[in-house]
Amino acid sequence: MSLGTAARMPSPKAPDYEKGKWAAAFAPREAGERRHWLVKSEPDVFSFDDLLAAPKQTTHWDGVRNHAARNFLKDGMRQGDRVFFYHSMANPQAIVGICEVVREGYPDPSADDPQWYAVDLRAVVRLARPVTLAEIKARPELADMALVRVGRLSVTPVTPAEWETIVAMGDRGPG
């Protein structure tokens, strides 16, 4: 097999989300339909506590420089969607809170190139108990979650079933 062929073949660990699971993130919506997402941040750069301390508990989510994640910001996230806030590069790595999209995708003001997008997020609630990556990986019903399958992305969709499972694991939070 040539290197070119190998590069085009889907990884057995990372299913073809563009044609499968991720396609739902871009599908037409019913009126009032709310979708769910996950964003990652290193807590020493910007934490959920920082979001809670921000004016109106709101911030612009900028600095994303990955095309797949940019597409979720630009074309997937809509006002009213709910978002898990995940602390990456932390000990432990965990989902710690829930946010809401309050402004849909717009050109990222921190970027020199207008191809990059940002959204505005507002804190909704801190989870009563953080849900760690280890706990997520231990749950068979979360095995296909984008966080587990393609953990490098800083913005990913979350299915309704994944959302409900994690909210229950965190003991608190609106749907």
Where does each model-flagged region fall?
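Structured loops at beta-to-helix junctions and adjacent beta-edge loops in soluble globular domains
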Residues: 40-42, 124, 158
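Compositionally biased, charged N-terminal/linker segments
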Residues: 2-78, 173-175
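Aromatic- and Lys/Arg-enriched surface recognition patch
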Residues: 94-155
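Short, charged, solvent-exposed linker or helix-capping segments at domain edges/interfaces
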Residues: 50, 130-136, 167-169
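Short, acidic Gly/Pro/Ser/Thr-rich loop/turn segments
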Residues: 44-46, 128, 165
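Charged phosphate-binding loop/patch that engages nucleotide di/tri-phosphates or the phosphate backbone
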Residues: 158-175
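Short, charged beta-turn/beta-strand-edge "cap" motif at the junction between a beta-strand
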Residues: 86-92
